[in-house]
Amino acid sequence: MLVGACGLYSLHPFPRYRALSYSRSTLPEVIIPGPEGRLEGRFAPAPRPRAPVAMILHPHPNAGGTMNNRIVQELYKTFQRRGFATLRFNFRGVGKSQGTFDNGIGELSDAASALDWVQSFHPEASTTWIAGVSFGAWIGMQLLMRRPEIRGFISVAPPANMYDFTFLAPCPSSGIIIQGEGDEVVTPGAVQKLVDKLRTQKHITIHHDTIPHANHFFEHEMDQLMRSVDNYLDMRLDPNSPIR
């Protein structure tokens, strides 16, 4: 059953992410003006003014999710390698970011402010992408509905059994949803229902990859996860791609 944001954490507590996070990045820290004060981030500028923009959103703050989450860092690196102006940041109350957890409402505002910030450095960006992991995938999909410049998304383990995704009516952009077959937190069946619903909509194409044996953290299947991401980006970023 889908539930609203306020009831998520008490009904469906996430496992802790902290043990699966990398150590602090050596990239320069950036401070972004957010709705409740500063937001801590890491930013990789692009080599050219019209380069595309990408932003990656981390898992649930109350479960130890941060911008140093392993999957977040891998997504960050793959966009950076492709020449994107790439940002990852901590939601309010995480790390050096000011504020307190706001059940998704404030976090969506954080994401909007962060995207404004990165776009200010690349106002002529050719395209914008959003990627999110678990809770971050839910926030990212909401941001997608509010920002028409977002042309693609990567959603890893979107918590379709915990949060209401009916706001995607219609979903304005094509993207990929990636799920672990052995995910003990986000049930594959709930994600499949979300995919099936999105695929009934016109003018978008939804890819869906299921990674065999992978749990919610993809701790033993990171290579397979990133291969799925890279294959999708190869296809979407090809000038001859049928998906725009």
Describe the residue ranges of each PLM region.
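N-terminal cap/lid segment of alpha/beta-hydrolase-fold proteins
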Residues: 11-49
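Short, surface-exposed "cap/lid" segments of acyl-processing enzymes
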Residues: 47-84, 88
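Alpha/beta-hydrolase active-site loop
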Residues: 101-121
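Alpha/beta-hydrolase fold nucleophile elbow
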Residues: 122-133
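Gly/Ala-rich beta-loop-alpha elbow adjacent to hydrolase catalytic centers
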Residues: 132-140
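Short beta-strand/loop motif that positions the catalytic acidic residue
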Residues: 171, 177-179, 183
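Conserved alpha/beta-hydrolase "acid-adjacent" motif
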Residues: 184-190
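Catalytic histidine neighborhood in serine/cysteine hydrolases
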Residues: 198-217
